[in-house]
From Swiss-Prot:
GO biological process: translation
GO cellular component: ribonucleoprotein complex; ribosome
Encoding gene, per UniProt annotation: rpmE2
UniProt key word Ribonucleoprotein: yes
Protein name: Large ribosomal subunit protein bL31B
Domain of life: Bacteria
Species this protein is from: Acinetobacter baumannii (strain ATCC 17978 / DSM 105126 / CIP 53.77 / LMG 1025 / NCDC KC755 / 5377)
Gene3D superfamilies: Ribosomal protein L31
C-alpha cells in the first residue's frame, strides 16, 4: 500500500453562525483559520446553516404562499380553458 496518498484526517471545529452552535467533527477539509475550543486549537470553518438551524431539523414549518401564485395563474389563463 502506498504511503502519503490520503488526505490528513483531523478534528475540525464547525460553527453554525445562525444558531451559534459549535460542532467538533473529524474531517479532511483544509482551512486557514484556527480557533481555540475547550483548551485546544482546531481548524475553524463557519457555516450559514446546519442541522442546528435548518427548519427541517428544528421543526419550524415554513409554508410558501402558493395560493396567490396559483390564483394569478388561473386568472391569467382562464380564457384558454373554455369548454365548447
Amino acid at each position: 500500500m502506498r504511503k502519503d496518498i490520503h488526505p490528513a484526517y483531523q478534528q475540525v471545529l464547525f460553527h453554525d453562525t445562525n444558531a451559534d452552535v459549535y460542532f467538533l467533527i473529524g474531517s479532511t477539509i483544509q482551512t486557514k483559520q484556527t480557533k481555540e475550543y475547550q483548551g485546544q486549537v482546531y481548524p475553524y470553518v463557519t457555516l450559514d446553516i446546519s442541522s442546528a438551524s435548518h427548519p427541517f431539523y428544528t421543526g419550524e414549518v415554513r409554508q410558501a404562499s402558493n395560493e396567490g401564485r396559483v390564483a394569478s395563474f388561473n386568472k391569467r389563463f382562464a380564457r384558454f380553458n373554455r369548454k365548447s
